[in-house]
Amino acid sequence: MRTKLRGHTCPPDRVPQGSLRIRFLHLAFANTWEIYLILLVASFLRFYQVDTSEFDDDQAILFRLAHDAVYHGLLPITSNTASISIAHPPGVIYLFMLPAALSANPLWGVVFVGIFNMIAVLLTYLFTRRYYGRLAGTVGAFLYATALKPLTYGRFIWQPNLMPPFVVLFVFALFLGVVERRKGWLFPALLLLGILYQMHETAILLFVPLLVAVVLAPGTIRWRDLAFAFVLLLIIFSPYLLWEFSTKFADLLTLYRLEGHGRLYLEGIGYYLFFISSFGTPPANMHSVVRMLAPLLSWLGVVMPLLAAGGFVTAGWVVMWTPYQAAPAPPGRLQGIALRIASTLRLGWGFVRRWWTTLPATPYRCGLLLLLVWQIVPLLLLLLHKIGLTWHYFLILMPGPFILIGLFVSILVRWSRNHGQKWNILRYGTYVLISLVIIAQIVNCTVAIVDTASGNFSDRDFPPYPYHNDLRSLQHALNEADKLAQQRHLNRVYITTDAATQTALRYLAEQMQTPTTLFDATKCLVLPNSATGPAVLLVGPYDGLTNALLRQFASATLIDQPARLGGPPFRLYVVTPNAGQGASHDGFVQNLQLLDGRAQHLNLYNSSWLVTRWSFMWSEQPRFRTTYNYALTVLPNGDSEQSRQSLCTFTSMREGDELLVAFDLPVGGSVPTSVTIRTQYFVTVPNDPVYGPLHAETNNSLNTAWVTLQATDGEDSITVVAK
């Protein structure tokens, strides 16, 4: 073979290597240039303003478990807890250990999720181009990269958000057996299914297309693939099996009990369509850019489902079409309806038999059938789900609709090209329509990100959390508190928490330089010991009781209000407690000293509260995932039927610090003249079992025995006057 360069013919070994390399790179770029554009758009959408990512309870739990596993040498055996109170498998924790090993900052976990979702876009392009052509691959990958709902799940830490690349790889493995008829596909398919199940239990629905693949390609099955898959699945599930054995399979029993209840969830079809169209009800926030552009983008909600329907119909037509010749009619004329029905059934059975006979001989049709089964059967099973539907259940179906749209566009363009110039308008119109859809989706995603980064949303619209928090706002507030303490040489930062922030703030506060005390501010407030001087107090956005207690019982100077996206800001104070008005020698031995012999009355939000003042008589330093708890119960006028309890939780305690405990009084009742107070103490520690040399890690916690505290007079209660 001889190569021609610049008009000369020379042997290959004399061709300049640099010229060959340049030509090769030029050809490679010419054949794949679109993927660079797709990845550029995908990376912009997934990493622009990525620090505004959601950081609520689940996000903090997942990254904390990964971080603690790395830095404390623990073996994760569960992940976070599901909404039905079962423990998820720990596979995702092992993945998040990679960014956690590099930094304790959860931002790198968010970047890690974004990278995984970019890989999913790349795999979508490679898969679709391999089996359905370059145009189909380009359209499918571009639509998937710019779809709003999949993008949303690619911008925050959560175990289902790592599923997309593994879903595409799973379908890839099935196609290796069904379409290419290669052996050895079953092993990676089973392994990938196990990995997906570790990310979310709904992945078990992908077992249906796996069974269909086995039926369509029986000659490719090897027994050793099953053996290899069994061994590796046993290895990756062994940590979770340790947990299940120790709990006597309580999680599986919970799932079994739920199987008897359920209904048909037709709204699941709407969920599926929204994943495709990326357009739904505009946000209620009047400053939302998405809301402003909604009239210009609303057509996406019609066009995208129609394109997807075109993909389904096209794939279904190709799958069902088979060469057909009518059987010769029997001699004589059919008499009666019975004979006509029999003839129709005979013809139908003949069609089905010929279709099934010819199907295995056409791998292309087998692949399309597999795509349809992947999209239709799990969707129908989800509609019959026993415990309700949520958005992330549909991630196992992505990017299937976009692949089918790419197939539809490719076949439509090829058909119009093959039928002469009179159909050129259809081809060019298709190009224009797809280009407009992609541009509109890019605009829709970009303005949605701008809305999130600008706070043009309500932080209350994120059930099941009381309110939503983002990583940037939380880190900024903690950094401001830390910086203030260092600038003023204050030796402690007190931080209020509630159900929405306690997990996230407890983890993030560990990166602060100044010692911290975090406490649940639902009914309690911790103030510094007046003898040690003032301290910094960071108050949450909805801690109205804390602000009311500060006004009445402390000297608080508001320094700053660190902004929060989508809701009211934090409040940053420098505080010192006021002097007690009625000194008391009562208290609970070696635990709490009563500072004021009177319980003071407080009105807040049309409700009445009684407030008692105490000081800690001992200290406890922060410990690994440990909290210290006092449960105080009051009996107004000694009446146990009107009892009220307040639970105070702290990450640390310092001797001499002041504790304010508030008790809400019955609505419409009168203020009591006296209250009797009883107190119990317990510690919450992580439930990390030990199996010989293995120190396991779970998300669960254990409470030590509740100890009833003894008062200084030997009784188990203290009675104080209320005013």
Describe the predicted segments one by one.
Residues 62-68, 72, 101-102, 204-334, ...:
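Transmembrane-lumen/periplasm boundary regions of multi-pass, lipid-linked membrane glycan transferases
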Residues 2, 17, 131, 135, ...:
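Membrane-interface transmembrane helices that cradle and orient dolichyl/undecaprenyl
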Residues 77, 425-519, 585-588:
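Membrane-proximal, lumen/periplasm-facing interface regions of secretory-pathway glyco-
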Residues 140, 185-200, 211-212, 232-235:
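Membrane-interface alpha helices of multi-pass inner-membrane proteins
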Residues 1-10, 474, 478-492, 513-723:
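C-terminal luminal/periplasmic domains and tails of membrane-associated envelope-modifying transferases
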Residues 42-49, 60-94, 98, 102:
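Extracytosolic helix-loop segments that constitute the early lumenal/periplasmic catalytic or substrate-binding loops
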Residues 40, 107, 111-131, 169, ...:
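Transmembrane-helix motifs of polytopic, lipid-linked glycan transferases
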Residues 153-154, 205, 333, 356, ...:
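Hydrophobic/aromatic-rich transmembrane helices and adjacent perimembrane loops
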